[in-house]
Regions:
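Acidic, Mg2+-coordinating active-site environments of NTP-dependent enzymes
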Residues: 2-100, 106-130
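Nucleotide phosphate-binding/pyrophosphate-handling subdomain across enzymes
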Residues: 1-10, 15-18, 92-208
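A general structural detector for well-ordered alpha-helical segments in enzyme core domains, enriched
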Residues: 33, 172, 198, 225-226
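Alpha-helix N-cap/helix-start motif
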Residues: 23, 54, 109, 169, ...
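Hydrophobic beta-strand segments of well-ordered beta-sheets in folded domains
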Residues: 41-44, 67-68, 182-185, 207-211
Length: 228
């Protein structure tokens, strides 16, 4: 930690990633690195990929004396059959407008932010509703509406995502499943990622896959090696 004290910590989705920096190259090692040195304050924990990881995160935080708020226990969010988005915590219920970012997985990120903003900053409900319609999130299912790439894409819809681990491939795949148009995937990755597992998420979901090189990046996997 670079701070002696903090107001709060938000823990996002933890999954297999950045093993090259870890001595324990497993999900347990990732969880340890992300939770073992958190300062004592307030910790808000997002929904995890599965219950097993969620339990491991909770166990890893047992010795931390912070106030802890877990998705599914202390706050929750869901989309009803009539598409209403409902948020709940011990302060009360909120019916939320549709966010201006793509992907239902973002509802979990939004819920963690709402929990923190209500508990720590006492943000008003109307400001929360306004805020989730004005989110600026770069490189996460971000629709590109202008610029050089959009000119190349023409009338096609262009969406970019910088996801590079298995959990992000699940997220992208789930979003693709919700689309009514054919999806063509263009992919470039670094050498140290789980390429086969990442790509397996898109089997049977996309119209085509195009592998490209990452320009001026020594750590990128070449398109020829990727295809093999």
């Amino acid at each position: 930690n670079v701070f002696k004290k903090n107001l709060m910590t938000l823990i996002g989705v933890i999954h297999n990633d950045h093993f090259q920096w870890l001595e324990n190259k497993s999900i347990d090692g990732v969880i340890h690195e992300k939770t073992c040195k958190l300062l004592n304050s307030n910790i808000f924990i997002n929904k995890q990929v599965n219950d097993e990881i969620g339990k491991k995160v909770e166990e890893s935080l047992n010795q931390n004396t912070s106030n802890k708020y877990f998705f599914g226990k202390n706050f929750n969010i869901s989309r009803s059959d009539n598409s209403f988005i409902q948020y709940q915590d011990d302060i009360g219920e909120l019916i939320l407008p549709e966010p201006n970012i793509l992907g239902d997985h973002q509802l979990y990120n939004i819920s963690t932010s709402i929990a923190a903003s209500r508990k720590i900053f006492n943000v008003k409900d109307q400001d929360i509703k306004s805020g989730i319609q004005n989110i600026s999130l770069k490189g996460r299912l971000q629709e590109i509406k202008s610029g050089k790439l959009k000119k190349i894409a023409g009338n096609n819809r262009l969406v970019v995502d910088g996801g590079h681990n298995i959990s992000s491939s699940y997220v992208i795949a789930n979003w693709i499943k919700s689309q009514t148009q054919k999806v063509n995937l263009v992919v470039a990755m670094m050498k140290d990622k789980e390429h086969q597992k990442f790509m397996k998420s898109f089997e049977g979901l996309v119209n085509s896959v195009t592998i490209i090189d990452i320009p001026n990046q020594d750590g990128g996997i070449s398109k020829n090696e990727f295809k093999e």
